[in-house]
Amino acid sequence: MGFMLYEGIDSKSIEEITEESEKTKTDLQKANTPNKTEAVHSLNNTCSEQNSGTKDYLNSLQFLPSNFRPKTHKKKKSVSSYLSSTIQKNANENIPHVQCRNDSQSTVTTRNPTPFKIEVGIYPSKPNNLNKEPPASTVHSDNLGDAVEHEWVELYDPLFPTSYSVFKESDYANLCETNWSHYVNQVPSLSIEAKLSNIVNASKSGIGPPPSLLSHATLARPSESMVLSNNIAAEDLDFFKKSPPVPAISKKENVALKMLQRCGWKEGQGLGQHNQGIINPLHVEISGFVTETKHSKINDK
């Protein structure tokens, strides 16, 4: 059926468009010679689908305006897919043949009977020296006498003990000694001396008001109430300072004798409930005092 599509833009029918697309398709196939070869790259998982599942309906609509053409969604191909694919050339036709593999090497064959391999590395190869252990920086017990400089800044390892004689003769010990002597014997700078002098002067002299306030200042006499309050406060202080005298206990009064008499005790009786206690009281005689060096006596006059 022939009807007009897109009037005002294109006067061709769909049948004419399909016929012209088929002609251009055949012309393109004839124009492609076997000498022109191109490398075909595909993904690892979808290479077979991309080679076989081509859509031809897009070619039939290539004469439509660009506004009405369906847009193809192109997938982003990773770099690893190109590197993992292997390219093989046919000796008779020189047409590339793609085989998807998961190997990290790609083999390329040409008309020459002897194939050669091209190693393609996705990541840079690691050096072989990384697996080796780093050299020990500590000094072993066998090498203590050798002239090997030791890194004294590192932590101490009890498996490889150090020697003070080796440390004393090392450059690190000499450097520490020179730095300490320089720190002790250094001359104080002028800025430090100026700061110290300012601190001393500020501690000796108090901070007074500015001279502009002193010129307008006037001295007022204290009022009579202030003088009386000061006098009363001084008298109160004198009164509290004088403490009352402590009554002295007379030696003649025997307090223990009075307490016994109140309890019913009489002279000549024994102590206790049945009056069988001590009748004669104990007397203390002061003979002297003993020290760590000598024994002295007290002579009562």
Swiss-Prot record:
Biased composition (Basic and acidic residues): 16-28
InterPro entries the UniProt entry points to: G_patch_dom, RBM17
Native source species: Schizosaccharomyces pombe (strain 972 / ATCC 24843) (Fission yeast)
Name of the molecule in the record: Uncharacterized protein C2G11.04
Domain G-patch: 252-301
Gene Ontology biological process terms, A to Z: alternative mRNA splicing, via spliceosome; mRNA cis splicing, via spliceosome
Pfam family, one: G-patch
Gene Ontology molecular function: any one: nucleic acid binding
Compositionally biased region (Polar residues): 29-38
Disordered: region residues: 16-38
Disulfide bonds: none
Entry GO terms, CC: cytosol; nucleus
